Amino acid sequence: MAVPKRRKSKSKVRTKRAHHAIGKPNLVPCPNCNVYRLPHRICPTCGFYKTGIVLEPKVKKPKEEN
């Protein structure tokens, strides 16, 4: 079974992991409502995609008290 010949130092390990960071998401404004959304996806606020409204946005109903 293979075993490392030398122990990796902290700086070597951390240098290798320097490229593992998560990048920030690429956001684009919705052409209909100007809210930022992910590209190539339906707008979560208005339901607009490319040429028209694909989904009707969900409207939250207020809770009724008993």
From Swiss-Prot:
Protein keywords: Ribonucleoprotein, Ribosomal protein
Q: Which InterPro entries match?
A: Ribosomal_bL32, Ribosomal_bL32_bact, Ribosomal_zn-bd
GO term, biological process aspect, one: translation
Which parts form a coiled-coil structure per UniProt? none
One annotated Gene Ontology cellular component of this protein: large ribosomal subunit
Residue span of region Disordered = 1-20
Signal sequence annotation: none
Give one Pfam family, short name only: Ribosomal_L32p
Q: Select a single GO molecular function from the record's annotations and give it.
A: structural constituent of ribosome
Do you know which PANTHER family this protein is assigned to? Answer: 50S RIBOSOMAL PROTEIN L32, LARGE RIBOSOMAL SUBUNIT PROTEIN BL32
Q: Which family does it belong to?
A: Belongs to the bacterial ribosomal protein bL32 family.
Its protein name is Large ribosomal subunit protein bL32
Q: Which organism is it from?
A: Leptospira borgpetersenii serovar Hardjo-bovis (strain JB197)
Q: What is the lineage of its organism?
A: Bacteria, Pseudomonadati, Spirochaetota, Spirochaetia, Leptospirales
